[in-house]
């Protein structure tokens, strides 16, 4: 089977809000990966795949065996895998690289596929503004913060994280609506990059949890990948067109 497509997904938030809900979602993600494995040249997991993740030197959070096993299967079959650090799983280090041959992306990634240019980012703290969050993100990613957290016993550190996951507001969200003002930041980013001589066809991100595919600038498109608690959306590029699609188990 010819592997020629690029697939993009984000915000699985595995671990939230509880074990049963997360396991059901993990099974659906695995079914989706199984569905795309024959034609997937590359799979981009674009942040907040886990509601929490921290790699101690010799310990990783337990669980997610089905997902990791399926990713290993894809990697062994020649599919390239990319993991973007999100705001919930920014403490991914080298475990996935060693075990899954996965490329770990800390911030943005710029690439070209079949003549189309892509700007990829989880979506947190990108563009102008949001200086408070950017400072907090820098603090959490610092070696000092990571060292301090690693001093806590995994039962305490992961236990606290799981407690906060159980309070996830995302799982309780019933209705969302799109506001045009929410596009100002991505429009500003597109203009800023264009002024620097960088033109992109697609800006693909997650983080904001609302699936959308809208035109920005002259010819660019902004695709938000949504999330998998309420929407189960993903994007696929077949070398000609990029589409935002909904995963249905019966598909």
Which residue stretches match the model-derived regions?
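N-terminal short leaders/motifs
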Residues: 51-74, 168-200
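Structural motif
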Residues: 113-114, 237
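Core catalytic region of metal-dependent phosphoesterases/phosphodiesterases
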Residues: 2-5, 9, 14-113
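Active-site-proximal loop/helix segment associated with metal-binding centers of metalloenzymes
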Residues: 123-188
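Short, flexible active-site-adjacent loop segments at beta-strand->alpha-helix junctions, enriched
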Residues: 87, 108, 117, 122-125
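Conserved beta-sheet core of the metallophosphoesterase superfamily
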Residues: 101-103, 119, 124, 128-136, ...
